[in-house]
């Protein structure tokens, strides 16, 4: 069964006797006929002549639906071509099998940076128009508004704007760095000084702690001025002699200070009597010793 469009009365069908050779159809790509009778090739853009004709008819006031019927191009294709022309000013299609050619060249980016530096409040569409007026870019390769906004937001672009201020700050930075090196000693000397200081502090802390321990371990012995009494003697904390120890049977003033006590006879556990010293008696004391 033959296709229903086999005898389609348009010379654009390849089987028609009035069909003219089209180089776009010679590579074996899949071709088809749209609802209006026009031939299209999948994956291939519309011819530049047809694109220019669509734009020309639109500028003369023809509606997109009428352009679609007259040129036998789908309405979606016409709308896409016109939208691309109004946004970029170009009717050329994108590169087949790759990305679009780069329009944001270093020269264009530098010019955008100059415009933005001279007038920070300039809008993207004003920058785009300025590029065209200064003949830096043409209608076909001028960056779009979104591309200009992306360039302005880029970090490298902001660094390029801040380049004049960074040069002045870097010129003042070496003088401060040299003065810092002149004031501060080398790192090795600083480390040696810190180590010696820490060792000295540790030694001083050890000496202080040793003196504190000695003062706590040694009981205070305060001698009364002009007398031979001591605190231990006044408090009566002398060791008690025992009957089993022979060396305490014969009391000797050389072995112990017996100036505060006297014996009542035999030396026993309860035979030691405390003598009240004169130095601690009150002034109105009149008793007998």
UniProtKB/Swiss-Prot annotation:
Disulfide bonds: none
GO cellular component: chromatin; nucleus
Molecular function terms, GO-annotated: DNA-binding transcription factor activity; DNA-binding transcription factor activity, RNA polymerase II-specific; RNA polymerase II cis-regulatory region sequence-specific DNA binding; RNA polymerase II transcription regulatory region sequence-specific DNA binding; sequence-specific DNA binding
Effect caused by changing residue 97 to E: In n578; almost normal male tail. Abnormal egg-laying by hermaphrodites, as a result of defects in the vulva and the uterus, and their subsequent connection during the larval L4 stage. Abnormal morphology in vulval cell vulF
Subcellular location: Nucleus; Chromosome
Region annotation Disordered: where it falls in the sequence: 166-198
Keywords: Chromosome, Developmental protein, DNA-binding, Nucleus, Paired box, Transcription, Transcription regulation
Taxonomic superkingdom: Eukaryota
Stretch list, region PAI subdomain: 32-88
Entry annotated with the keyword Cytoplasm: no
DNA-binding region range list: 29-155
Function: Transcription factor. Binds to specific DNA sequence motifs in regulatory elements, for example in the genes encoding transcription factor lin-48, apoptosis regulator ced-9 and neuropeptide-like protein nlp-2. Specifies cell fate, playing an essential role in embryonic and larval development. Involved in morphogenesis of the vulva and uterus in hermaphrodites and of the rectal epithelium of the tail in males. Plays multiple roles in the development of the egg-laying system, acting in both lin-3/EGF-pathway-dependent and -independent processes.
Entry-linked PANTHER family: PAIRED BOX PROTEIN 2 HOMOLOG-RELATED (PTHR45636:SF31), PAIRED BOX PROTEIN PAX-6-RELATED-RELATED (PTHR45636)
UniProt name for this protein: Paired box protein 5 homolog
Gene from which this protein is expressed: egl-38
